[in-house]
Design a protein with these regions (language model features):
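Juxta-kinase regulatory segment immediately upstream of eukaryotic protein kinase catalytic domains
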Residues: 1-19, 69
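ATP-dependent phospho-/nucleotidyl transfer catalytic cores
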Residues: 19-23, 45-46, 52-56, 113-128, ...
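Short N-terminal amphipathic alpha-helix/helix-capping patch enriched in small hydrophobics
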Residues: 14, 25-28, 40, 58-62
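ATP-binding pocket architecture of kinase catalytic cores
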Residues: 37-61, 67-148
Length: 214
């Protein structure tokens, strides 16, 4: 069944093994190993449509972002570009699509970046490297020439998030609102609420430009 899903994508090489990869909480992720030494291995993902209902929009955003970053890296004379930006594989039936629908499920494939690791334990060195990577990401996308779509409505809208919180507090579904520890956290949030919503207001007023968020 998994090999059938892979067959919907325009990849190089013959599939020799497919096994789970990583411990992600949102999408189902698999490593696709190829038999040929000159063919890359791949990552196969089933996109969670409960979280991302508009997969086409998600993938169009990804295409815009990765294409822009790739051009920036090429212009800067960077080496090993395929290690620095993701390469998604087109669907066989439509090379403009970076996903395939198989039995109602949405799948995507990308080239696997060999010898890459995910840090589970945080230390100052890793934090510094992560901060640098996010900074480079933001800098490269500051002049992206297209407007990306909002994949999860109001995901970063703190006014909306605080309203959600207040509605849950009013209902108190598990009877914990009165607990001292919970009250302390709620007071802390309330004290910072004005500041938390400042960016949203400044964005509406045109003071802050929209930026791409990872």
């Amino acid at each position: 069944e998994l090999k059938n899903i892979v067959s919907h994508f325009a990849i190089r090489g013959t599939v020799s093994e497919i096994k789970p990869l990583g411990a992600g909480l949102i999408n189902d992720t698999l490593l696709v190993t190829t038999a040929e030494a000159d063919a890359p291995n791949y990552v196969l993902q089933r996109v969670n449509t409960n979280v991302f209902p508009d997969v086409d929009l998600v993938m169009r955003n990804i295409y815009a972002v990765t294409t822009h970053i790739r051009k920036k890296l090429e212009a800067a004379g960077e080496t090993e570009i395929d290690r620095k930006v993701l390469t998604f594989m087109p669907a066989k039936d439509d090379e403009t699509k970076l996903y395939a629908i198989v039995d109602g499920q949405y799948w995507r494939m990308m080239i696997f970046i060999e010898n890459a690791v995910t840090k589970q334990a945080v230390n100052p060195e890793s934090s510094r490297a992560a901060g640098k990577a996010f900074g480079q990401f933001q800098a490269m996308l500051a002049d992206i020439p297209v407007e990306l779509g909002e994949t999860i409505k109001d995901f970063h809208n703190m006014e909306f998030r605080l309203q959600q919180l207040r509605e849950v507090i009013a209902k108190d579904p598990v009877g914990r609102v009165a607990e001292p520890e919970v009250q302390a956290m709620l007071k802390e949030i309330d004290a910072r609420a004005e500041y938390m919503c400042q960016a949203e207001r400044m964005g509406r007023e045109g003071i802050l430009p929209k930026r791409v968020c990872h």
